């Protein structure tokens, strides 16, 4: 797989282009260590204090491997990967990592440090949105997308599912999470993310299995965490 780390995300002519750009800028700011200019009432929120302290991200990050742990030599596509290769136990799993990310800053960090960490497992990172997976058909044993669907409407995720199906090997797993709008943290976190520059969509959790079914797949199981529900999805061969 090729590695791309461009300086700027190109304009996206799709209906979701503006939101894609907004999410990219929001994470460029964070990964680049740039300060956010937020109103005092937001900075006084407990969720903001936890975020600044570094305790929020570990709480809300979905441990997808509790549902399907990557196997040795599995080819795994991590959509919206951030810097996951640098912080998750990919070396322990001995799985092959291909990243897909819209933040140029995150892509640059992975491109610089991934090969140093493990050049055999790190297969590169492509800068691009989740609805454009330009890989060879049936390339991956598993695809992962955590912390991504919450920023987009359901019709966007239908397109992502179509793209994932093309690049998964027959019988491969797709693991994605969706925000639980009933979670205590959901509304405060959505407010914080909006002020950080990326609007969050609080969709009813019942919409996701129906969406998956409409794209010819099925939800095999789910697992709830503090903020997100993880969906374990498969297309039957």
Enumerate the predicted regions with their spans:
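Conserved beta-strand/loop positions that form the S-adenosyl-L-methionine
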Residues: 79
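A short glycine-rich, Lys/Arg-flanked "PGG" loop and its adjoining helix->strand segment in the class I
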Residues: 158-170
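Class I (Rossmann-like) S-adenosyl-L-methionine-dependent methyltransferase catalytic domain
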Residues: 1-73, 82-132, 152-157, 173-237
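A conserved beta-strand element that flanks and buttresses the S-adenosyl-L-methionine
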Residues: 144
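Conserved acidic residues
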Residues: 74, 141
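Short catalytic micro-motifs in class I SAM-dependent methyltransferases
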Residues: 147-148
